[in-house]
């Protein structure tokens, strides 16, 4: 649980801001906050995405997260850093990071606790179920 505290801090700081009347949290901001919570280790900012300049905010975090397998692109060698992060993406990023930390991310119960599972993209369903089950995300109606 100790290693999950930075992730809980991340969610406490970022996700309420996204739900309020403030600008939504971008994909780059979310990944940068995750990287900072993980210790903000120095990392080569030269990542694989054509829309993330080496000196842009979040470039180091995005390259770090990509190399760990936490993030992937949005297609066409792009990351789309300025697009708001979706709850599906947030859940996916968090689950992949938890797996990187060696946490159990298996969820045998699946959609039982989810009330809008028919609206979830198939690529994100397990991650959303997991993030909800472990208390990282709340399910909304």
Walk through the language-model features, giving the residues of each.
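Bacterial N-terminal signal peptides
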Residues: 7-16
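Bacterial N-terminal signal peptides that target proteins for export
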Residues: 1-5
């Amino acid at each position: 649980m100790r290693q999950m505290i930075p992730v809980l801090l991340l969610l406490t700081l970022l996700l309420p801001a996204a739900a309020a009347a403030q600008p939504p949290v971008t994909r780059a901001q979310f990944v940068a906050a995750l990287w900072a919570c993980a210790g903000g280790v120095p990392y080569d900012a030269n990542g694989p995405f054509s829309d993330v300049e080496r000196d842009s905010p979040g470039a180091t975090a995005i390259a770090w997260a990509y190399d760990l397998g936490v993030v992937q692109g949005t297609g066409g060698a792009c990351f789309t850093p300025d697009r708001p992060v979706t709850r599906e993406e947030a859940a996916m990023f968090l689950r992949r990071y938890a797996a990187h930390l060696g946490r159990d991310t298996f969820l045998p119960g699946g959609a039982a606790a989810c009330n809008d599972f028919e609206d979830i993209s198939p690529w994100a369903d397990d991650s959303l179920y997991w993030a909800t089950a472990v208390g990282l995300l709340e399910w909304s109606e």
